[in-house]
């Protein structure tokens, strides 16, 4: 029987291409051709479904829709999702209104001006005869460079009342005025803030006439106080405390926060930023103070109704729970 030949090139030991004849039988070629024709016929039949079959398929798809593949959407891919829903792993945070401060901002840069202002505040403190403690919100600002690190303490801001904030720029000063030091150490003044102890230590390093330890002993860290009163756990920033306690959002613009706080004069954005930090601190203090009074009242009523033993048992249970939370969050 005649044979068909296919020419294929092969390499010899000398890398010379030679032609090798491979015999292919005629009946093998016909079998391959027949198989291809059968596959083509089957595909044609598959594509020629009747209207009834097509309708049945559509009904099946409607009753049992294909499951969507669960995927963790990133911020970039989320916008491209068809349904536009956010990732289920993250809850949408509550939109809080931004803090708006409409009170006075008293800004001083000269040593004698700062001294006179501090003396004025101290006189006001001493007139508060109905209060054993006068809370003053305290905060500081300084320039920061990724090359050289934190600069010298440049701004001290305090809030005595919620309608008035004081901003003292220290850039020109070699020493902090004695009147301001006396105000900070006044027996009735209770300075408060977030991570306030670290601020006092930095102030002492930059201006040795300020002793940090006496201030640390009587100051109040708002985050620690919040955990005690509200039975929360973990560390707090001023921004998170504003969200949790005051239900307000803070505009912590990096451009302002990392700005040149040592340059005189401060611009309007810097002054507002500095004032809001201590203003909201005073708001948070008053809120936690009221919560503490309510808590103490409720505890007293519980003791009267259930006895000291029941109160101590409930208290111990709460402290155990808090300890577990702190282990996780710290």
Curated annotation (Swiss-Prot):
Major enzyme class: hydrolase
Binding site for Mg(2+) 1: 139, 141, 277
Region (Disordered): 1-92
Keywords for the protein's UniProt record, in alphabetical order: Exonuclease, Hydrolase, Magnesium, Metal-binding, Nuclease, Nucleus, Phosphoprotein
Keyword Phosphoprotein: yes
Domain of life (superkingdom): Eukaryota
A cellular component annotation (GO) from this entry: nucleus
SUPFAM superfamilies according to UniProt: Ribonuclease H-like
All copies of domain 3'-5' exonuclease, residue ranges: 117-289
Subcellular location: Nucleus
Function summary: Has exonuclease activity on both single-stranded and duplex templates bearing overhangs, but not blunt ended duplex DNA, and cleaves in a 3'-5' direction. Essential for the formation of DNA replication focal centers. Has an important role in maintaining genome stability.
GO MF term set: 3'-5' exonuclease activity; metal ion binding; nucleic acid binding
Annotated Basic and acidic residues bias: 27-39, 48-66
GO biological process: negative regulation of mitotic recombination; nucleobase-containing compound metabolic process
EC number from the UniProt entry: 3.1.11.-
InterPro entries on file: 3'-5'_exonuclease_dom, 3-5_Exonuclease_domain, RNaseH-like_sf, RNaseH_sf
Listed name of the protein: 3'-5' exonuclease
Gene: WRNexo
Keyword Nuclease: yes
Pfam families attached to this UniProt entry: DNA_pol_A_exo1
Family, per entry: Belongs to the WRNexo family.
Positions bearing Phosphoserine: 79, 87
Residues that, per the record, bind Mg(2+) 2: 139
């Amino acid at each position: 029987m005649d044979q068909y030949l296919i020419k294929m090139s092969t390499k010899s030991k000398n890398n010379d291409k030679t032609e090798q004849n491979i015999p292919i039988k005629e009946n093998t070629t016909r079998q391959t051709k027949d198989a291809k024709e059968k596959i083509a016929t089957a595909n044609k039949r598959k594509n020629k479904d009747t209207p009834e079959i097509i309708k049945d398929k559509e009904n099946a798809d409607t009753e049992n829709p294909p499951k969507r593949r669960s995927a963790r959407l990133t911020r970039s891919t989320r916008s491209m999702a068809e349904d536009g829903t956010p990732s289920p792993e993250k809850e949408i945070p509550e939109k809080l209104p931004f803090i708006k401060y409409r009170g006075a901002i008293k800004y001083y840069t000269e040593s004698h001006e700062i001294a006179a202002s501090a003396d004025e505040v101290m006189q006001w403190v001493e007139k508060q005869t109905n209060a054993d403690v006068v809370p003053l919100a305290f905060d500081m600002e300084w320039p920061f460079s990724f090359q050289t690190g934190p600069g010298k303490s440049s701004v001290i801001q305090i809030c005595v009342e919620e309608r008035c904030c004081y901003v003292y720029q220290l850039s020109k000063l070699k020493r902090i005025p004695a009147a301001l030091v006396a105000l900070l150490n006044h027996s009735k003044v209770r300075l408060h803030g977030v991570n306030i102890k670290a601020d006092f230590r930095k102030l002492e390093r930059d201006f040795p006439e300020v002793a940090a330890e006496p201030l640390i002993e009587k100051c109040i860290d708002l985050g620690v106080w919040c955990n005690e009163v509200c039975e929360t756990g973990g560390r707090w920033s001023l921004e998170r405390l504003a969200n949790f306690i005051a239900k307000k959002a803070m505009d912590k613009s990096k451009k302002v926060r990392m700005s040149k706080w040592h340059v005189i004069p401060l611009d309007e954005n810097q002054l507002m930023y500095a004032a809001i930090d201590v203003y909201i601190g005073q708001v948070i203090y008053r809120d936690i103070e009221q919560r503490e009074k309510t808590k103490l009242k409720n505890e007293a009523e519980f003791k009267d109704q259930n006895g000291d033993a029941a109160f101590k048992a409930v208290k111990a249970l709460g402290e155990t729970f808090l300890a577990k939370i702190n282990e996780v969050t710290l």
